Amino acid sequence: MAAITAAMVGELRAKTDAPMMECKKALTEADGDMARAEEILRVKLGSKAGKAASRVTAEGIVATAINGSTGALLEVNCETDFVSKNDDFLAFVNDCVKLVAEKNPADVAALLALPLNGQTVDEVRSALIGKIGENIMPRRFKRFTGSNKLVSYLHGTRIGVMVEFEGDDTAAKDVAMHIAAMKPVALSMADVPAESIAIERSVAVQKAAESGKPPEIVEKMVEGSIQKYLKEVSLLNQTFVKNDKQTVEQMLKAANTTIKGFTMYVVGEGIEKRQDDFAAEVAAQVAAASKATA
């Protein structure tokens, strides 16, 4: 009997995207023969899982879970909006976000290795891929714990917000809704990332220079643009979405509430969606059919 090493299991998993335990079982059954192990997995899991797992996932949902002072925010991706409404997919996501809150996995790989319904999360995921025919993958998550109170808000299933706060629950919930609507990038002006300010300054300098005004006026125009930008993207300085006569900071002060931090996930942000060329796809299928009959 050939010795089955971790490297062999990793290689087979990379080729097939099958769960690690299934890869180990297949290699054991094949006595270490990689090609034979791949064949065993194709028979056992079908071709769906391996093919689907290589496709781009830019749709999906965001889910939240709160249990006392512990909470979790999770994004799980799939390929189409249709599957994001599938009951089995929704149940899988719900199970995963609860695991994040309860088990505190270090990263997505650790989440996939956690036990779920007698299997690992990755094994359940692979079976779901085979059943639905689309790639499914937890993309990112954040776990919250500590002395702060938590409130979450979901705008449909595509935008999820978790807010850490002290004070009034209703005011904090309103802020969570505001964040989903106005999408601030930082809590205060001082928290806006330096690289974001640098990019905005570069744009402002170029626009101001085109005005043809004296350098001292151009400098004031640039600083004015930067201050306007900082107010627009910092939560506390934004105009409150439910009352345009006050800022979020003013609303919170009146409610004796303090926001300690927030996190917002938007499904698919930063993922380049696959653009299908239907004509090219048909041509490829015709060419493949011609080769098969030649």
UniProtKB/Swiss-Prot annotation:
SUPFAM superfamilies found in the cross-reference section: Elongation factor Ts (EF-Ts), dimerisation domain, UBA-like
InterPro entries to which the protein is assigned, alphabetical: EF-Ts_dimer_sf, Transl_elong_EFTs/EF1B, Transl_elong_EFTs/EF1B_dimer, Transl_elong_Ts_CS, UBA-like_sf
Keywords, in A-Z order: Cytoplasm, Elongation factor, Protein biosynthesis
Entry GO terms, CC: cytoplasm
Keyword DNA damage: no
Main location: cytoplasm
Involved in Mg(2+) ion dislocation from EF-Tu: annotated span: 80-83
UniProt subcellular location: Cytoplasm
Stored Pfam families: EF_TS
One MF term in the entry's GO annotations: translation elongation factor activity
Keyword Zinc attached: no
Domain of life assignment: Bacteria
PANTHER family: ELONGATION FACTOR TS, ELONGATION FACTOR TS, MITOCHONDRIAL
Function field: Associates with the EF-Tu.GDP complex and induces the exchange of GDP to GTP. It remains bound to the aminoacyl-tRNA.EF-Tu.GTP complex up to the GTP hydrolysis stage on the ribosome.
Family: Belongs to the EF-Ts family.
NCBIfam families: tsf
UniProt name for this protein: Elongation factor Ts
Origin species: Polynucleobacter asymbioticus (strain DSM 18221 / CIP 109841 / QLW-P1DMWA-1)
Lineage, broadest ranks: Bacteria, Pseudomonadati, Pseudomonadota, Betaproteobacteria, Burkholderiales
Annotated gene: tsf
